[in-house]
């Protein structure tokens, strides 16, 4: 299924120049914090992998295991490193730390 926001960069002319990181986000469809986090990623032109875990307790447990026990959404990972949720994402951006993080390619497996 195509990401809901995939068409927005085309509409706005946004490009993902310089973004090399692998970005993953665990969400609930109606969560306002999830929507806000995805909008910031979209605004920056980031293509991300979204895991919608609405009502899926197994998926939520898997997310919590990966996120050091955190069970709130969104949970955002950049190059397999958990950065937290929406507030942490915006905090990184306001401190000028998000763009360099997004420019870092993932470690080869």
Curated annotation (Swiss-Prot):
Transmembrane segments: none
Protein name stated in the entry: Probable glutaredoxin slr1562
Keyword hit for Electron transport: yes
Pfam family, one: Glutaredoxin
NCBIfam families: GRX_bact
GO aspect biological process, one term: cellular response to oxidative stress
Keyword Electron transport: yes
Residues in coiled coil: none
Intrachain disulfide bonds: 31-34
Record InterPro entries: GLR_AS, Glutaredoxin, Glutaredoxin_subgr, GRX_bact, Thioredoxin-like_sf
Any one GO MF annotation of this record: glutathione disulfide oxidoreductase activity
Function: Has a glutathione-disulfide oxidoreductase activity in the presence of NADPH and glutathione reductase. Reduces low molecular weight disulfides and proteins.
Keywords, alphabetical: Disulfide bond, Electron transport, Redox-active center, Transport
PROSITE patterns noted in UniProt: GLUTAREDOXIN_1, GLUTAREDOXIN_2
Glutaredoxin domain boundaries: 11-109
This protein's GO CC annotations: cytoplasm
Family affiliation: Belongs to the glutaredoxin family.
